[in-house]
Amino acid sequence: MSDILSSLAYLTGKPVASAKIKAQPEHFQVREDLGFAFTGEGEHLLVRIRKTGENTSFVANELAKACGVKSKDVSWAGLKDRHAVTEQWLSVHLPKGETPDFSAFLAQHPSIEILATDRHNKKLRPGDLVGNEFVVTLSEVTDVADVEQRLEKVKQVGVPNYFGSQRFGNDGNNLEEASRWGRENVRTRNQNKRSMYLSAARSWIFNRIVSARLENGVFDKFIDGDVAQTASGTQLVDASNMAALQAQFAQGEVAITAALAGDNALPTQADALTLEQPFLDEEPDLMALIRGNRMRHDRRDIALKPQDLAWTVDGNNITMTFSLDAGSFATSIVRELVIEEKVEREY
């Protein structure tokens, strides 16, 4: 994983095995699940694509050209990895109801396939998905037995719900820029950059808080003043309800949360506030950016438990299948299993 994550704690200790990740695009497959049906009519053409070795923005721009529209008229629910084989929907604003001839587009881009088209009355917006299904192959694993033991642990309790290195840009550039923007009070109309840098800022503070809970032995334990996520909303933890909430946590019915920092005060109290607040105070530049853009405080589960996790072993290769809710990172699961070996990619 990226060096920016190297300081963060592991649930079961730093992995002893190494492996190659994404040695081939087919070793990291992602299938998007929007979780809702289309209306079958409307101003927006929905195009389901499968791309290999391409990023979402590039495909969207090329699709816009093929449809004779501007790039801003093509949108998506989530960005997908470049070094992978991924399936997702893109929406194109074509209010006249036309369906373009994509034959030239497909001939020009053999790494892109169109799997289906449909119509909908709304465009796709970031976050308009329930999750993603993954097929991930770890190749040339140096200690298969250790990885399988770790997989059993992940299946039972999950992993730290860290934001992956993708959130912070190449070599952490997004985080560095977020700090600079906060320090220099930068103002911009570039919504994409502002969104990226704000996300990096909040994600980094969250990651540090989660790491601290691991280091302090309270990753799977409520402490006084925590904010629990329940089926009906959030609940402040104190002596009167801690035992009951801990029992519900053991059954997977409630979750422990950590801060996604905002310009308002943390809702945590007592011991939980003592744990979280220093990480906001230690990042004055990031907090200046967050407050300057009036981001409101939010919470995020500190544990990530993959759904339907299964795996097969073929020699020194391990192939995993699992599903994750939107906003979770498959790389955070891989990080708990192996140390990533450098791959010289030709794609």
UniProtKB/Swiss-Prot annotation:
One of its GO terms (molecular function) is RNA binding. InterPro entries: PsdUridine_synth_cat_dom_sf, PsdUridine_synth_TruD, PsdUridine_synth_TruD_CS, PsdUridine_synth_TruD_insert, TruD_catalytic, TruD_insert_sf, TruD_pseudoU_synthase. One of its GO terms (cellular component) is cytosol. Pfam families: TruD. SUPFAM superfamilies: Pseudouridine synthase (SSF55120). Keywords: Isomerase, tRNA processing. The active site is at residue 81. It catalyses: uridine(13) in tRNA = pseudouridine(13) in tRNA. Its EC number is 5.4.99.27. GO terms for biological process: tRNA pseudouridine synthesis. Residues 158-305 form the TRUD domain. It is an enzyme of class 5 (isomerase). HAMAP family: TruD. Belongs to the pseudouridine synthase TruD family. NCBIfam families: PRK00984.1-4, tRNA_TruD_broad. Responsible for synthesis of pseudouridine from uracil-13 in transfer RNAs. This is tRNA pseudouridine synthase D. It comes from Vibrio campbellii (strain ATCC BAA-1116).
